Structure formats: C-alpha cells, structure tokens
Amino acid sequence: MKLNKIYLQSFRNLQETMLMPAQHFNIFYGNNGQGKTNLLESIFIMATMKSFKTARSSDLVRWGAISSLLKGWVERDGVTREIAVFLDNQGKKIRVDQKAVTRIDDFFGHLNVVVFTPEEVNMVKGLPELRRKYLDRAVFSSDITYLSVYHAYSKILKNRNMLLKRGEKASFDIWTEKLVEQGKNIILSRLAYLDALRDLLKRFYREISGNEEAVDISYRPYHMDLADCRGDVADAFAEALAKTATEEERRGTTLAGPHRDDVEFILNGRPLKQFGSQGQQKSYVLALKMAETEYLQKKFHSQPIFLLDDLSSELDQERKKNLMEFLKKRDMQVFITTTSLQNINVDEIENYRTYRIEEGKVLH
C-alpha cells in the first residue's frame, strides 16, 4: 500500500500543495508551527475520516476559506484508487474514485495508517479515556464492524443515561438489555485485539529498548472481573449493572460498561504508569505502534503507512536507531516530521525525499 500522490487545498495553514511522495521515506523538516504535523494529519484523515488533533471539522479549514479538499491516490496490489475528502463546518464528505461514499464499510481499508505522535506517550499516565481512545482506534483499524457497534452502544448509553436522570422506569430494562448486548460485542472485540497484539508487543519492546524487560497489556473492566469477561461477558456485564443500580439511580448515569473500562500497561509485572521511567514509557508506546503495524500487515497482507510526528522530541539516539531499523527493514511507506535533518541519518536509508516546510509552504 503506497500513496503515489497527495493534493491538499485550504487545509489548516498549508497552501495549495501537490506531492509525489517517495515509496519509502518522506521527511518533512522545519521549525515548529510551520505545518509539518498538518501534512501527517491530512493523511490520517484520508485513512480514518478522523483527525488525531481535533474533533471539529471547522478547525481543519484554512483561515478565510469555506472548505478544504484532501486527495490521495493510493496504490495497492497494482490498483490505484482516488480518495477525496471534503471538509467544511458541516462535517466531512468522502468520494472514492469520484463516487460518493455514505457507508463507512465502503470506505474502510482503502488506506491503512499507524500514527505515532509525542502526545500519545501521555496516555500511559493519563486518564483511562485516553487509553480507551487508543484501543478503540486500533481495533477499528483492523475490524470493519467495530465502529458501527461502538456507535450503536454510544446511542443506547445516551438513552439509558437520560432515563436514569429522569427516573423513568417504563422502558429502562429494555435499554439495559440493549446496552448489555452491544457492550458485550465491544468488550469481546477489545479482548481479541489485545490477545492478538500481546506477543508482538513483547517482541518489539525488546527490539526498541534493547533489553529483556517483561511487558504485558491487560484489559481492566470497570466493576467486572476479567475472568468473568472471558467466560460469559453478557452475564458479567448484566451483573455489574445490577450491583451498581442503586448508585446509578443516585448519580443519574451508567457506572459499568466498556465506556468506563481501562487498559493497563505492565512492565515487569507492575503498572507502567506508576513504576516505569520516562524512557520505558516511550519505549512501550512505540512498541505498541510497531506491534499494531505488524498486526495490520498480517491481517490485510499489505503494509500500512507509518506516520511519525516530531522524531526529534520523544526518542533518544538508541531508540531512534532501533525504530529506523524497524522501518528500513519493511517495504513500508513512511512519513516523518522533524525540526532538523540532523535528527535522521539519511545516508543510511534508500528511496527517500526531503521537504522543507516554511509558513505552510512545502519546499522541495
């Protein structure tokens, strides 16, 4: 899977841009605030229809413009498809090969990406919401059905919470049954993904850190026992809701379910967020991304595109070297941003292009 051409119009601070990326490494360099990350963000949006920086489409449109256009020509197995995303204050519209796409199923899989940004290290010590967001995005990248289940659960949860706030009992049990059914599917999908990722995570942590520390990743259901979730998830979820029923009525919100669950990152048998150094946390998150890359390749039989934001800020020389070795060994298209080319030894890589970014201009 490769992006052969990219066209951007009125996106963020970027001026009208046309790129013909290299098949392997593409390096965008320049001072902070010039628009480097915006280029990676545009690729991510073309792949997922979401930004990794904002939830509002209006934030993505260049100041003074009424809309933005993103286009990417993606080659896979000898077939090239044109992906076009239109952005305005009403939201996003998608076209594939100039045909409107209304169902996410018809869009899924045309462009697979893995992104690593400096902010993602924050999820180690941050709120559970950050780790859930990471996990949901990763599961969706590999499972076309997950997003529709997630949206269905969110709608049911909203209705159930509304009934709790109003103290209405008439249809409450029906909404609880629906919540359990969709919640079960989310938990099972998350568990399956983590099970598939676990051995890859261990392998790549050794590669990136250069040591034999033991890492693991574990799902932490809220008000549920993990062993029960691996048995009958629906029963475990229903029991958790029954246990929290009195407190739910008092607080007017649903207190158990995948919207409250967490993911625990583990180092040498202990929580990484409490006992891991900053370097260990960086290595762990990067190993997660490497594992995700390998998993997508195995699932789709095609290498995803790797987006690496701000190489200079998050990695020391040893981790940087190990990451570059990982990327060089794969027939993978890579887009990297950095403040200086001195952060990357371009003499050691093949098939690359460099671009200087200055005030929204892409200079070759």
Curated annotation (Swiss-Prot):
Its main location: cytoplasm. It is found in: Cytoplasm. Keywords: ATP-binding, Cytoplasm, DNA damage, DNA repair, DNA replication, DNA-binding, Nucleotide-binding, SOS response. ATP binds at G30, N31, N32, G33, Q34, G35, K36, T37. GO terms for biological process: DNA replication; DNA synthesis involved in DNA repair; double-strand break repair; SOS response. InterPro entries: DNA-binding_RecF, DNA-binding_RecF_CS, P-loop_NTPase, RecF/RecN/SMC_N, RecF_2. The keyword DNA repair applies. GO terms for cellular component: cytoplasm. Pfam families: SMC_N. GO terms for molecular function: ATP binding; single-stranded DNA binding. The keyword DNA-binding applies. Coiled coil: none annotated. Belongs to the RecF family. The RecF protein is involved in DNA metabolism; it is required for DNA replication and normal SOS inducibility. RecF binds preferentially to single-stranded, linear DNA. It also seems to bind ATP. This is DNA replication and repair protein RecF. It comes from Geotalea daltonii (strain DSM 22248 / JCM 15807 / FRC-32). The gene is recF.
